Amino acid sequence: PCCSKLHDNSCCGL
């Protein structure tokens, strides 16, 4: 998932 630190977590709202 994109909310993982191993991926682009920009979709988490960060």
From Swiss-Prot:
The modification Leucine amide is found at residue 14. One of its GO terms (cellular component) is extracellular region. GO terms for molecular function: toxin activity. Signal peptide: none annotated. Its main location: secreted. Keywords: Amidation, Disulfide bond, Secreted, Toxin. It is found in: Secreted. The keyword Disulfide bond applies. Disulfide bonds: none annotated. Contains 2 disulfide bonds that can be either 'C1-C3, C2-C4' or 'C1-C4, C2-C3', since these disulfide connectivities have been observed for conotoxins with cysteine framework V (for examples, see AC P0DQQ7 and AC P81755). Expressed by the venom duct. Is present in all duct parts with a highest content in part 2 (proximal of the venom bulb) and then decreases in concentration toward the end of the duct. The cysteine framework is V (CC-CC). The name has been given by ConoServer. This is Conotoxin tx5e.
